[in-house]
Amino acid sequence: MALIVASLFLPYQPQFELDTSLPENSQVDSSLVNIQAMANDQQQQRALSNNISQESLVAPAPEQGVPPAISRSATRSPSAFNRASSTTNTATLDDLVSSDIFMENLTANATTSHTPTSKTMLKPRKNGSVERFFSPSSNIPTDRIASPIQHEHDSGSRIASPIQQQQQDPTTNLLKNVNKSLLVHSLLNNTSQTSLEGPNNHIVTPKSRAGNRPTSAATSLVNRTKQGSASSGSSGSSAPPSIKRITPHLTASAAKQRPLLAKQPSNLKYSELADISSSETSSQHNESDPDDLTTAPDEEYVSDLEMDDAKQDYKVPKFGGYSNKSKLKKYALLRSSQELFSRLPWSIVPSIKGNGAMKNAINTAVLENIIPHRHVKWVGTVGIPTDEIPENILANISDSLKDKYDSYPVLTDDDTFKAAYKNYCKQILWPTLHYQIPDNPNSKAFEDHSWKFYRNLNQRFADAIVKIYKKGDTIWIHDYHLMLVPQMVRDVLPFAKIGFTLHVSFPSSEVFRCLAQREKILEGLTGADFVGFQTREYARHFLQTSNRLLMADVVHDEELKYNGRVVSVRFTPVGIDAFDLQSQLKDGSVMQWRQLIRERWQGKKLIVCRDQFDRIRGIHKKLLAYEKFLVENPEYVEKSTLIQICIGSSKDVELERQIMIVVDRINSLSTNISISQPVVFLHQDLDFSQYLALSSEADLFVVSSLREGMNLTCHEFIVCSEDKNAPLLLSEFTGSASLLNDGAIIINPWDTKNFSQAILKGLEMPFDKRRPQWKKLMKDIINNDSTNWIKTSLQDIHISWQFNQEGSKIFKLNTKTLMEDYQSSKKRMFVFNIAEPPSSRMISILNDMTSKGNIVYIMNSFPKPILENLYSRVQNIGLIAENGAYVSLNGVWYNIVDQVDWRNDVAKILEDKVERLPGSYYKINESMIKFHTENAEDQDRVASVIGDAITHINTVFDHRGIHAYVYKNVVSVQQVGLSLSAAQFLFRFYNSASDPLDTSSGQITNIQTPSQQNPSDQEQQPPASPTVSMNHIDFACVSGSSSPVLEPLFKLVNDEASEGQVKAGHAIVYGDATSTYAKEHVNGLNELFTIISRIIED
């Protein structure tokens, strides 16, 4: 038995390598625009754009009398901006280095001066390091600070800021200006500070050509590529392929030196490291998303040129771009690329893409033998575009992944992947799940278009799973990219063991119902035996949404009954391996970085934050709270520093402008910004050892997300803070807040005042108070680590599947048989026992039933007036009140009950019971008495009091035909056999009436009621009819939960069917029934009405 793990990306991917000495290298070089031929002004602009942020900002001109903001680079003239705005295809320094290297290098080689602009900077440089940033030396250049940069199309305008100083704080050198020539040594465990040392291998990555056909969404791209084609000449079949050339982040030889499932920062669910990419990056599964303003956290991005911002510059192939009028050029380019990739050597390397927390957890479980290694099979995409790779090479790659790594690739064309992942997942589904409802006027058409690709991708995953599945295997599907897969697999494998885990938040029903495909997504999830969430809140939202939109029945707040199956809905937070992280903290490099940090910020309080750069992280609100804190506590301007690390390459210009205005405003509070900079804003991630060191030295860690799943960054901080026991400020809107609320300081990011006060509280908290709080946090981290998540999730999947297997042995309702019987019959009668008030959906279905000539009756214990009010909106509905005592025919009530004079005597008995059981009470209706004990103060005595009452009443009134019974802790006392008498009354009437629903005739309504007949008559007779028809009822259906009232009706229908009195009889019970006369079963009332609605529609 194997564990089949399905997620968007496999933990391994193919990597094509190219030796620069080979002839193919000249092809690669010639296919790209020559960067060294760029003009000097373009090089200057490139240096400006490569700053704290990944894109320049649009800023208004400063008002008169307000000091201008301090520039982070040399002053540019308006002409420079004009030249920049008129330049297309401008390559930035990032273009010289691929995103793969850029992501993995992080900050081990930060420079201490400006980002080089000279083309000679491609040569190796020595001794460039972040150590200069951490150095306490005051001889560091201070010509640049964290302040908003200008947009290329803004003629020299600047953001107004009260900053007066024209000096630079050395902290800006930490990761703000990464030396792009120092990128390899940390990846290959090289101690050298130079990058371009070592072998001459390069990685060649296929480029996605998805979306090259002309579409309305890609108009701007079409224009740009046409211009590029015109200026570069025509392209033919012999043109070089469109590929990416980068310095290898992991060569085949280097891959052998580290485990293939290497540890990843567990907070990077979808590897935020992979989000940092240059504008040229073209890997299908790893690119920036400039237009996605609600950038997903922990997620890879696919960058396709037609979806990029119109202001983004592009480097197009030298041979002239793409043809948008004919597919011939595209196929010619593909053939050219395939020729190259058919000759390039390739290897399988670990992938940095995908859910890092999930992969780390499974890897740990394998190492600890919780899951046998050979019993884990991975299903996912290969992580690179596949259109340009020849089919035989893809087949070889697939075989290698299957045979050596137990990884089964899902191969899909680039168009499908791009539309499903980037378009639907990233721009429709992910924002909605995080309460960011897309409001673009074109989003509806966009959503409908991309949905079919999302469904297609999910179907391919389902097919791949079915292909490798063997009896006894466990299928575990992960995250919102694959929400349709569970039901798709269930359709083919009805008895498979299937689990699904959602790693992001799940919104309330009011938000989720905004999705056009909401029912299809929910039905896809209900195909699983188990659906797991990160918090109780998200699980509750899913249950409520399913109940509201699917009319699924919810049981005990942890089960969902739908479509004949029970879905277990639980919450189990994913965690980290705290003990493994503790061992990494003892590494020598971490200790060295900690020493440098202590020397650099000696005597200062460090506030550390690490967030994805998007709107839901609350970065702007965090800075506003910090600003308010400094204004109200000015002594902390020189005593504290907030280091904000932003990861990802989102191009949200407006958000960046807002943030940088606040940053400048805060830094202007310092009297000498070159010595004391209150805010250090870094739009780039740290090396993991640096990140651990900084977290270990932090005096406060702040998470201010406006909505998030499980934030594992704060989990790692807790482990890192073993020495200092620093407080954690945690947003109440993160999944981690429900887990860490005992030890963390919970904040509301929108409450700026309390947020700022919480910062002061955290910084001034003494050690004797911090220590107990930290112990609570650490205990929660250990108790909810990755191992616990794996064990609990797999156990829940198995238990849920086992329950469904046992439940499947009960004779379930055969919907097909019910439909056939319904369609073949002419006169049909339904009796529903419904104890709760009807929903609007029930009312609608009942109206549909009665409008099609069906005889429909509702029976319950409600009095006549209440029952009439509840179902007044249903035309021609029949009613049976007080469990059969009264029957309504065409608006006229008929008495079935014989005697009611016993009620006062029974009431005297129950008065004594009420005195003995405070909180209980009884109600007297027209034909019955109810004794309620649900609100009794002493619940331990309820059972004994109920037993005494039933025994007393049945002993005294048995000879009078009065009986007491208990149902759901409510004692009901009434005449025996009323429900059965009412049903027999209806059968006799409708088997004799020519047209029982003919309201044009007053003959039925004027019939004498049973109560007006001679008291000596022992049997109630149905109202007479002037004509008698042989058109008897040939279809009878009785449904409800098992109870003493309904069981006689189940038996009656079965007897009528067995004796041939009705052609088809169906006795359907819903809910939990241990012993019943019913022969068919559904999970709940909502499911029953869903089946009924399908039958009457067909």
UniProtKB/Swiss-Prot annotation:
One of its GO terms (biological process) is trehalose biosynthetic process. Sequence repeats lie at residues 144-150, 158-164. Residues 72-86, 213-227 have a biased composition (Polar residues). GO terms for molecular function: catalytic activity; enzyme regulator activity. InterPro entries: Glyco_trans_20 (IPR001830), HAD-like_sf (IPR036412), Trehalose_PPase (IPR003337). CDD domains: GT20_TPS (cd03788). The modification Phosphoserine is found at S49, S53, S56, S71, S77, S135, S147, S161, S229, S303. The modification Phosphothreonine is found at T251, T815. GO terms for cellular component: alpha,alpha-trehalose-phosphate synthase complex (UDP-forming); cytoplasm. Residues 320-812 are annotated as: TPS complex domain. Keywords: Cytoplasm, Phosphoprotein, Repeat. It comes from the Eukaryota. It is found in: Cytoplasm. Residues 59-86, 129-168, 192-244, 274-297, 1000-1027 are annotated as: Disordered. Residues 228-242 have a biased composition (Low complexity). Pfam families: Glyco_transf_20, Trehalose_PPase. Induction: Repressed by glucose. The keyword ATP-binding does not apply. Residues 144-164 are annotated as: 2 X 7 AA repeats of R-I-A-S-P-I-Q. The keyword Repeat applies. Gene3D superfamilies: Glycogen Phosphorylase B. Present with 1960 molecules/cell in log phase SD medium. In the C-terminal section; belongs to the glycosyltransferase 20 family. Regulatory subunit of the trehalose synthase complex that catalyzes the production of trehalose from glucose-6-phosphate and UDP-glucose in a two step process. May stabilize the trehalose synthase complex, and confer sensitivity to physiological concentrations of phosphate and to fructose 6-phosphate. The trehalose synthase complex is composed of the two catalytic subunits TPS1 and TPS2, and at least one of the two regulatory subunits TPS3 or TSL1. This is Trehalose synthase complex regulatory subunit TSL1. It comes from Saccharomyces cerevisiae (strain ATCC 204508 / S288c) (Baker's yeast). The lineage of its organism: Eukaryota, Fungi, Dikarya, Ascomycota, Saccharomycotina. The gene is TSL1.
